[in-house]
A protein has these predicted regions:
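A short glycine-rich, Lys/Arg-flanked "PGG" loop and its adjoining helix->strand segment in the class I
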Residues: 365-377
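Class I SAM-dependent methyltransferase SAM/SAH-binding core
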Residues: 291, 295-341
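Short, glycine-/aromatic-enriched active-site segment of Class I SAM-dependent methyltransferases
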Residues: 383-403
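Conserved alpha-helical positions within TPR/SEL1-like repeat arrays
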Residues: 11-19, 42-53, 76-87, 110-121, ...
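A conserved beta-strand element that flanks and buttresses the S-adenosyl-L-methionine
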Residues: 353
């Protein structure tokens, strides 16, 4: 076989294997092409895409840059380079790539959509809105476009009509692609934001029928009052929810929901931490043994690290723990159910901090008793909660899927667990559907 024919055959075999997900087969075939012709633009391009899929993003960028120097008018290559930058949060570089792709191919579907997404990530909200509208104007039957624009409208509502418009986009996305069940989750939450709870329950009922093993729609049906509310969110629900949410958790919570529980907890602990540092100057051992209980992606870690001798984190979601490992700062991270973990570690910590975790527990008696036992004498527990309005008693599962607690109930269960010096500060710690949610932070001490 002559060289040109052998090269063409190897490239075709590589591309076929690549499309079929056979990366181990495709990579050496692309490299064979490049051995025959070291400046082959398609082999450079597609090998770059493959290396990105394998987590070798820096090498991928080099190969795509080489490909684009050879074929600068290749819209797909510009778009794929933009995708790599986007996934590494280099949003300005991604924007430039997508704009070059669209200058060459104004209807390029992936570049249209991803330009809108990176403009949103860059917090250029008005430009992002226009980009989403342009995407759907050019591709009105794109289910992904309807879903993403609906998500954008819920995250950046200018008025109630935006959320109502989001509902229509979610319905449109599902009509175009009924296999995308994540659309039903977004639709249910949008309807909750509009206080159309019965409609939200109908959506969750439909979702539960389509995906009977998924715990999320079952939990949300209970949250809407259409099934009995559990005493706490099930382990399977928490894992499913947060494993799927881990990669975008920080951006969604901090940017879109105004999440500020970590700093509020540090603020409420300020007198305790100041007293500890004063004691260190008088000869006490430096630092505290601290547990971040329900640590998630580790948002509390940087705030706690400066005060810790040893900083541990525990979470039920392995996906969230992966993000916490990438963030760093913890001496130990453990995948476990929180109450059982605390029960297994008596008198192990000087301070336990729990941000946005008790909202997945209705009844708090067992958890607070376990936290009390896991503290050393004189240790403190600080946590955030969402609260019921006024003098409402007990606890309730809200249509958001999160539990809210009455102030009197919190006081009673803390006292019952043996805590003293309970201090509560009312604070709105996050938004939902554009509105601040009533909540607060609590500091309590285990007596000597």
């Amino acid at each position: 076989m002559k060289g040109a024919a052998r090269l063409a055959q190897s490239l075709q075999q590589a591309m076929t294997a690549h499309r079929d997900g056979q990366l181990d087969t495709a990579e050496p075939l692309y490299r064979r092409v490049l051995k025959l012709q070291h400046a082959h633009p398609d082999a450079l391009h597609y090998l770059g895409v493959l290396l990105h899929q394998r987590g070798r993003g820096d090498e991928a960028v080099i190969l795509l840059d080489r490909a684009l120097r050879l074929t600068p008018l290749h819209a797909d290559a510009h778009c794929n380079l933009g995708n790599i930058h986007k996934e590494h949060a280099r949003h300005a570089e991604a924007e430039a790539c997508y704009r070059r792709a669209l200058a060459l191919a104004p209807d390029h579907p992936q570049a249209l959509g991803n330009l809108a997404i990176v403009l949103e990530a860059l917090e250029r909200v008005d430009e992002a809105r226009e980009a989403y509208q342009a995407w759907l104007a050019r591709m009105p039957a794109d289910a992904r476009g309807h879903y993403q624009f609906g998500r954008f409208l819920c995250s950046h509502p200018r008025e109630c009509a935006d959320v109502e418009q989001a509902v229509e986009h979610f319905r449109g996305a599902f009509a175009l692609d009924a296999g995308q069940l994540r659309v039903l989750e977004a639709l249910g939450m949008a309807l909750y934001g509009l206080e159309r709870i019965e409609e939200a329950a109908a959506v969750y009922r439909d979702w539960a029928a389509r995906e009977q093993d998924n715990p999320i729609p079952r939990h949300m049906l209970a949250a809407c009052g259409a099934a009995e509310a559990p005493a706490r969110a099930g382990d399977d629900y928490v894992r499913e929810l947060f494993d799927g949410f881990a990669a975008s958790f920080d951006e969604q919570l901090v940017k879109n929901l105004g999440y500020r529980a970590p700093q509020a907890l540090i603020d409420v602990l300020a007198p305790v931490l100041a007293m500890k540092h004063e004691g260190e100057r008088e000869g006490e051992a430096a630092g505290l043994d601290i547990l971040d209980a329900g640590c998630g992606t580790g948002l509390c870690g940087p705030l706690l690290r400066a005060h810790a001798r040893e900083l541990s984190g525990v979470d039920l979601s392995e996906g969230m723990l992966d993000q916490a490992r990438r963030r760093g700062g913890y001496d130990r991270l453990v995948n476990a159910e929180l109450t059982a973990f605390l029960q297994a570690h008596p008198q192990s910590w000087d301070l336990i901090v729990s941000a946005d975790t008790l909202v997945y527990f209705g009844a708090l008696e067992a958890l607070l008793a376990a936290a009390h036992a896991a503290l050393r004498p004189g240790g403190h527990f600080a946590f955030s909660v969402e609260t019921l309005p006024g003098e409402a008693a007990g606890h309730a599962l809200s249509p958001s899927g999160r539990y809210r607690h009455g102030r009197a109930y919190l006081d009673a269960v803390l006292a019952g667990a043996g805590f003293v010096e309970v201090h509560f500060e009312a604070k709105a710690l996050r938004r939902e559907a554009g509105r601040w949610v009533d909540g607060g932070v609590v500091r309590a001490r285990r007596a000597h």
